[in-house]
Design a protein with these regions (language model features):
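Terminal and domain-boundary accessory regions
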Residues: 1-128
Length: 128
């Protein structure tokens, strides 16, 4: 319906979320799991950044990306964003964080960024 060929979600594998993982797979997402570690506070960390960038670069070089949508607020992805812009492959960044909390490094790339909080309000208005 939306013309999406492939939608990845990179995340740490936490067994108690197996029902969510199944739901996402049934919805058509390709899940890429990373072994988790726990920080000093007991918080699970998946550290998927390098895996995401590696897969994105592989897909780009193998011609599997026409237009990319990246969901992030993390400036660590700014080199990937710049690469996609140079290749005319970036559609938009969807930021889960507000404008104020989204990384300045992403903003400096010149990419179009839509903030999910803003989109939520638009969707709520449309559903009424």
């Amino acid at each position: 319906e939306l013309g999406v060929d492939r939608a990845y979600i990179f995340l740490g594998l936490i067994p108690k979320f197996k029902d969510l993982y199944r739901f996402l797979q049934e919805a058509g997402f390709t899940l890429v799991f990373k072994e988790i570690i726990y920080d000093g506070d007991g918080k699970a960390k998946g550290n998927c950044d390098a895996d995401l960038v590696t897969q994105a670069m592989r897909d780009s070089y193998e011609g599997r990306i026409k237009r990319a949508v990246l969901v992030t607020s993390d400036g660590d992805y700014s080199p990937l964003v710049k690469f996609w812009i140079e290749k005319s492959q970036l559609e938009i960044i969807l930021s889960p964080a507000s404008h104020e909390k989204c990384s300045v490094l992403l903003k400096r790339t010149g990419a179009s960024i839509a903030y999910l909080n803003d989109q939520k309000r638009i969707l709520e208005i449309q559903s009424k």
